[in-house]
Amino acid sequence: MQNFMNNLSGGSNKEGGEKSNDFLSSALGAEKQVKQAQTMKKISDMFPGSTSEKLAILNKINSASGGRVLETLGEIENSSSSQDEIITKLKGFLK
């Protein structure tokens, strides 16, 4: 436990502090990866079909939105009350 606390506090020398920063950087990086995975899961659940069909839809939305696919999907999801409404809005967006 003491080693863990030393690593978090920077330890008794500079090397320990660097380890602490590495530990925190790793934790923040892992948190970011988890959020990205959760976002991708939500996006995947929005669309029916195979992975290649889902990627084709995402590419169309990305092109139509000027590279703002995640923001666009978030806006559509937040302003919709059901899965059917999301699909209807996406179909309208892709025309």
Curated annotation (Swiss-Prot):
Taxonomy, superkingdom: Eukaryota
Induction remarks: Differentially expressed during meiosis.
Biased composition, class Low complexity, residue ranges: 1-12
Region described as Disordered: 1-27
Name assigned to this protein: Uncharacterized protein tam13
Native species: Schizosaccharomyces pombe (strain 972 / ATCC 24843) (Fission yeast)
Taxonomic classification: Eukaryota, Fungi, Dikarya, Ascomycota, Taphrinomycotina
Gene (name only): tam13
